């Protein structure tokens, strides 16, 4: 599954392999997922807040999603409703990121891409400077690096025999 699309709207079809009597999967078939669950963390709320600010909303309205993935309980319910034996859980990894602007560098890998794509190079530079200042307050660096809590959601399902 991709964390760039709303999961739970199309997720039941994805898990259809677990529905009793559905072809071509066999009883005992497994389905597993892991997705980032950090869309309510400061790295993302600060990005959305800045994008929604008076300075940026004209260019960035609708660019960032608020509900990118579901919660572990939602995935569990969908899998159980599909006739699977299932389990779901979450873990928060404390990533130690090296370097200056470590969290900004991290979110450039995926979360910040839609913003940067919607802006001119000069606008992107200004946005990143404002965003970086906010991130520095939320994620202060230490002599060891910058601690970045990264929540992941996991779920597994097995088609009932």
Predicted stretch roles:
Residues 63-161:
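Conserved Class I S-adenosyl-L-methionine
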Residues 30-57:
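Conserved class I S-adenosyl-L-methionine
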Residues 15-19, 45, 98, 102:
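Generic recognition of short, well-ordered alpha-helical segments
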Residues 15-30:
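A short glycine-rich, Lys/Arg-flanked "PGG" loop and its adjoining helix->strand segment in the class I
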Residues 25-27, 50, 54, 78, ...:
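Residues within well-ordered alpha helices
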Residues 1-15, 37:
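A short SAM/SAH-binding and catalytic strip from SAM-dependent methyltransferases
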Residues 11, 40-42, 69, 97:
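Loop/helix-junction capping segments adjacent to catalytic residues or to phosphate/diphosphate-binding pockets
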């Amino acid at each position: 599954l991709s964390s760039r699309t709303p999961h739970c709207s199309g997720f039941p079809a994805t898990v259809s392999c677990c529905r009793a009597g559905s072809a071509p999967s066999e009883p005992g078939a497994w389905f597993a997922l892991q997705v980032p669950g950090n869309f309510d963390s400061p790295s993302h709320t600060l990005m959305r807040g800045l994008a929604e600010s008076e300075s940026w909303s004209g260019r960035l309205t609708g660019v960032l999603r608020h509900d990118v993935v579901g919660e572990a309980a939602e995935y569990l319910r969908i899998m159980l409703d599909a006739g699977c034996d299932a389990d779901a859980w979450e873990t928060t990894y404390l990533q130690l990121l090296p370097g200056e602007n470590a969290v900004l560098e991290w979110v450039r890998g995926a979360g910040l891409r839609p913003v940067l794509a919607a802006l001119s190079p000069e606008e992107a530079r200004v946005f990143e400077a404002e965003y970086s200042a906010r991130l520095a307050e939320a994620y202060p660096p230490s002599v060891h690096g910058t601690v970045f809590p990264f929540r992941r959601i996991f779920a597994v399902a097995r088609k009932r025999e």
